[in-house]
């Protein structure tokens, strides 16, 4: 009975469905799904026939972005069960909701719930890039409907990562509120805010086909730390489109002339963009391999900084990787004295992040915040204080790096001109009381933000320690 119902779901979108519903859905069972599906896949999930019917009623006639994310039914049903238990929501509640909570992504998120779907897609894209594929025989996510918690305890890195993707999405949806006016949203609304663009099409595999747009010329002004608190309004108001999407991380970027919404941390197909030196009239066409900024930390630990990369591109029309091997501190921890003002910007950014970490923020664990350019002014959203502080650091650094001159002679991956010890940061926030970290003993601790008094110190640091180019006093050790 269960196997029949599961198999029949594949045919739902083809029977009187919406034109957006899974036109590329395979006619056969997805790869990796055993032909002998049986009840053992759903142990503890279905108690009886009524519970089976309840789950399928929860799925609705077409289950939106989940069809694009999941490649097998056991994992899908497990997610739906967790979504219903923890968030009290069903996929049917998201029928053509917003611009991303639908099967085919039509734009960037228009509200908080829509952003949850976007981040869920992106998380699976990045997992696929790491060759982490879904295994229907391994359901590692543990859902506790009594405590309304999701536990990821698998020792396998890929299983743990995929579980974390689902956990973050469900918890995000649980915190969000649905806007019924965004159900069955006309897709023209998602595309209406991207004038003067040229449409290209990319074929994708496991995730839906998307419509990338060639960027137009843009500029960006950095946002202060205090403005970061209002960023979420910009995310909801500037509803432009930039649909990323495939399990191969075939992704895109949109830069509109007036309003820009940019998904971060994803590869480009090599769209032509304008590269600007210090003279805006001198431009050359080039392709960016990605729109993230990579920073080589201690122990050869590569850190991905999507927000900084997106802001740099939006502000300068230069690919972020051009800044990664500049001077002594751009793109790595570095050593010696900064070579020029731009190099000092990179060191200042590193110091800013270190101060935020001392407040108890584990930056590597923070969810991604969309970057928005409205009237050439950058904003990045953020729910928690830690997210807002990270946005403030990145925005200040992007403005600083743009204001400084770019000296081609200082761009070298060898860093031969950087002898000595790493420059020390000004200890503007010392002493800082210990704040709860994500490694605390309870799930509640992991969601806590730094105390308000520490946030005040951090904001003062961002305002006070940055000079004319956003650079604070630096001294060697």
UniProtKB/Swiss-Prot annotation:
Gene Ontology MF term list: calcium ion binding; calcium-dependent phospholipase A2 activity; phospholipid binding; structural molecule activity
Region (Disordered): 428-477
Glycosylation sites: 38, 179, 407
Disulfide bonds: 85-145, 99-190, 101-117, 116-172, 123-165, 132-158, 152-163
Subcellular location: Secreted
Region named Phospholipase A2-like 1: 76-190
GO cellular component: extracellular matrix; extracellular region
Gene3D superfamilies per UniProt: Phospholipase A2 domain (1.20.90.10)
Signal peptide region: 1-17
Region (Phospholipase A2-like 3): 373-425
Key word Lyase present: no
Domain comment in the entry: Consists of 3 PA2-type domains.
Descriptive protein name: Otoconin-90
Source organism of the structure: Homo sapiens (Human)
């Amino acid at each position: 009975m269960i196997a029949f119902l599961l198999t029949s779901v594949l045919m739902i979108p083809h029977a009187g469905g919406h034109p957006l519903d899974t036109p590329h859905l395979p006619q056969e069972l997805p790869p990796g799904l055993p032909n002998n599906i049986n009840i053992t896949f759903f142990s503890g999930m279905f108690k009886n026939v009524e519970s089976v019917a309840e789950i399928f009623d929860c799925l609705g006639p077409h289950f939106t972005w989940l069809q694009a994310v999941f490649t097998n039914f056991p994992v899908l049903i497990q997610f739906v069960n967790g979504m219903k238990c923890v968030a009290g929501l069903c996929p049917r509640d998201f029928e053509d909701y917003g611009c991303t909570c639908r099967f085919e992504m039509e734009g960037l998120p228009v509200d908080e719930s829509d952003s949850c779907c976007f981040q869920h897609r992106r998380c699976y894209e990045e997992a696929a890039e790491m060759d982490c594929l879904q295994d229907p025989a391994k359901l590692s996510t543990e859902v506790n409907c009594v405590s309304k918690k999701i536990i990821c305890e698998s020792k396998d890195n890929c299983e743990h990562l995929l579980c974390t993707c689902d956990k973050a999405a469900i918890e995000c949806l649980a915190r969000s509120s649905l806007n019924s006016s965004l159900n069955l949203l006309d897709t023209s609304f998602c595309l209406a805010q991207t004038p003067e663009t040229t449409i290209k099409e990319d074929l994708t595999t496991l995730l839906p086909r998307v419509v990338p747009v060639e960027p137009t010329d843009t500029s960006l002004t950095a946002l202060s730390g205090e403005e970061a608190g209002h960023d979420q309004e910009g995310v909801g108001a500037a509803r432009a489109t930039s649909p990323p999407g495939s399990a191969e991380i075939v992704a895109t970027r949109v830069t509109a002339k007036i309003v820009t919404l940019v998904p971060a941390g994803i590869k480009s197909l090599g769209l032509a963009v304008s590269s600007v030196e210090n003279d805006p009239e001198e431009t050359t066409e080039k392709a960016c391999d990605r729109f993230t900024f990579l920073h080589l930390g201690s122990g050869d630990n590569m850190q991905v900084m999507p927000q900084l990369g997106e802001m740099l591109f939006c502000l300068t029309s230069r690919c972020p990787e051009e800044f990664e091997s500049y001077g002594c501190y751009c793109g790595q921890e570095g050593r010696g004295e900064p070579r020029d003002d731009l190099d000092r910007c990179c060191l200042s950014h590193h110091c800013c992040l270190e101060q935020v970490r001392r407040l108890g923020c584990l930056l590597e664990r923070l969810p991604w915040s969309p970057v928005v350019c409205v009237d050439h002014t950058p904003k990045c959203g953020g729910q928690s204080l830690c997210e807002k502080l990270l946005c403030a650091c990145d925005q200040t650094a992007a403005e600083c790096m743009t204001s400084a001159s770019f000296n081609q002679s200082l761009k070298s991956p060898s860093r031969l001109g950087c002898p000595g010890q790493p420059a020390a940061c000004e200890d503007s926030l010392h002493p800082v009381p210990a704040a709860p970290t994500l490694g605390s003993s309870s799930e509640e601790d992991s969601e806590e933000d730094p105390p308000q008094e520490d946030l005040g110190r951090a904001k003062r640091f961002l305002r006070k320690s940055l000079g004319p180019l956003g650079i604070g006093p630096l001294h060697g050790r």
